[in-house]
């Protein structure tokens, strides 16, 4: 992302929070603060799925709106200072899913079997990093303290 060399992901980790959405949001905030205090001078960039309007979408499954509710809770936690120095960014689901397709995740060695939620999070992370590499202003939005 910085410099002219080829980009590579040198290390990544993943996990999944379960249970009530409020609890998941609180755990995301705790993890963001923990990562900052352990390794970095600045907080991590938290990327959250933005709700894309799709006229073909007709699901009545309440879980499909879970990212919207968790995103709203993370906004509240950010406002309350519970995300430390992290920044919170919303990104289009369709952009993330078209950038980091299943085939590309396999090719990059980042495919995680089983959880669609973990794969969705990886898609958003990769997409945000690619956007940052292409746009220095976006890097400053993600990590304004660097």
Task: Give, region by region, the residue ranges found by the protein language model.
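Phosphate- and other anionic-substrate recognition elements at nucleic-acid/protein interfaces
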Residues: 1-146
């Amino acid at each position: 992302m910085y410099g002219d060399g080829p980009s590579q992901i040198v290390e990544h980790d993943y996990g999944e929070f379960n249970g009530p959405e409020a609890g998941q949001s609180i755990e995301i905030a705790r993890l963001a603060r923990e990562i900052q205090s352990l390794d970095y001078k600045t907080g991590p960039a938290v990327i959250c799925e933005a709700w894309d309007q799709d006229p073909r979408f007709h699901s009545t499954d309440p879980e499909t709106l879970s990212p919207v509710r968790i995103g709203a809770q993370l906004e509240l936690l950010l406002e309350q200072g519970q995300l430390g120095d992290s920044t919170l960014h919303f990104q289009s689901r369709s952009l993330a899913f078209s950038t980091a397709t299943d085939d590309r995740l396999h090719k990059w060695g980042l495919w995680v079997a089983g959880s669609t939620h973990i794969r969705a999070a990886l898609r958003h992370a990769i997409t945000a990093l690619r956007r940052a590499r292409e746009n220095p202003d976006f890097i400053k939005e993600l990590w304004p303290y660097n």
